[in-house]
Amino acid sequence: LCVLTATPPKQTDILHAYHWKDAKTNTVTISDHPKAGYREIITEYRVLQQQNGLCLAEITLHTGRTHQIRAHMAHIHAPLAGDSKYGDRRKNESLHLKHQLLCAYQLQFHPEADSCLAYLNGKTVTAPLPDFVSRFFPTFSSKNRK
């Protein structure tokens, strides 16, 4: 679950791109086309609510790469609120944000059958909504997540 400082181009989408990490600067670069050294990434998003120029979105990772959510959403011109690395500095300052508004509110387990975590297969763990949701989206409730 995250807050974006712009609305993505579609209400829901599955994004396919390529990701390269610069270990020296601890930043990543996203490309729409395959390149040497880049790894495929797949990020799914769904807009849950929009208000006052901000967008509450649910993100599902189909791959898990460094800064994937942050960089991929910035790549489509919908950066995370509070993100000092890939985000909109001016908007972050105007909102008085010092950290990114991103929270893993739900985890689903799909381990390999022979894994020591196999007993968790199909289990879902859901956390309460983070405080930033009520701060920026006071009319949103957990029932809207379905």
Segments (PLM) and residue ranges:
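RNA pseudouridine synthases
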Residues: 1-146
